[in-house]
């Protein structure tokens, strides 16, 4: 009984993640391995996600999105009230918003972005998906709406 009570206390403070290998990093922008993608999927939320066990696109940080008739303009309507995580060394002062989505895209897309090389200039997944040539523009419509315009219709 005492061992069971102690185990409960430890598990409340310890995260155990079973994986086939060690993640190479915990920044999804430079992931190249399945182990890193698997580990990061438990930490980070995405704009859209896949239905569990399938390929149907479902809401994530975007509660909904519109696609233009020509398939080139995606307008993402972001969820309100999404909080950043808390840590003793960093206290977020605002909710997630359109600026964060734009930052996440531009730090991988634009070499002129001051954060392009902070973690690595090798944003291989983003590059391998052809995103730099596919994205024409990313615009903030309002605090919770982002418009992404593509050079051609495509759903990578």
PLM segments and residue spans:
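Sec/Tat signal peptide C-region and signal peptidase I cleavage site
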Residues: 6-12
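Extracytoplasmic
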Residues: 12-14, 21, 42-44, 60-62, ...
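N-terminal lobe/hinge region of extracytoplasmic solute-binding protein
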Residues: 18-70, 106, 113
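Solvent-exposed coil/turn segments that connect beta secondary-structure elements
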Residues: 20-23, 31, 52-53, 70-72, ...
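Second-shell loop/turn segments in exported
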Residues: 29-34, 82-92, 134-137
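Extracytoplasmic/secreted proteins, especially bacterial periplasmic and envelope-associated proteins
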Residues: 42, 56, 60, 96, ...
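Aromatic- and charge-enriched surface segment that lines or borders ligand/interaction sites
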Residues: 63-114, 147
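Surface-exposed binding/hinge segments that line
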Residues: 109-156
């Amino acid at each position: 009984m005492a061992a069971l009570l102690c185990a409960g206390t430890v598990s409340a403070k310890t995260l155990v993640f079973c994986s086939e290998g060690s993640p190479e990093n915990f920044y999804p922008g430079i992931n190249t391995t399945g182990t890193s993608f698997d580990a990061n999927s438990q930490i980070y939320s995405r704009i859209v996600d896949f239905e569990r066990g399938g390929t149907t696109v479902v809401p994530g940080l975007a509660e909904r999105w519109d696609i233009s008739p020509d398939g080139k303009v995606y307008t993402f309507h972001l969820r309100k009230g999404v909080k950043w995580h808390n840590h003793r060394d960093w206290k977020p002062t605002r909710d997630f918003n359109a600026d964060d989505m734009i930052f996440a895209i531009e730090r991988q897309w634009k070499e002129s972005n001051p954060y392009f090389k902070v973690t690595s200039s090798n944003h291989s997944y983003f590059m391998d998906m052809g995103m730099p040539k596919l994205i024409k523009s990313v615009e903030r419509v309002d605090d919770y709406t982002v418009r992404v315009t593509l050079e051609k219709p495509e759903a990578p």
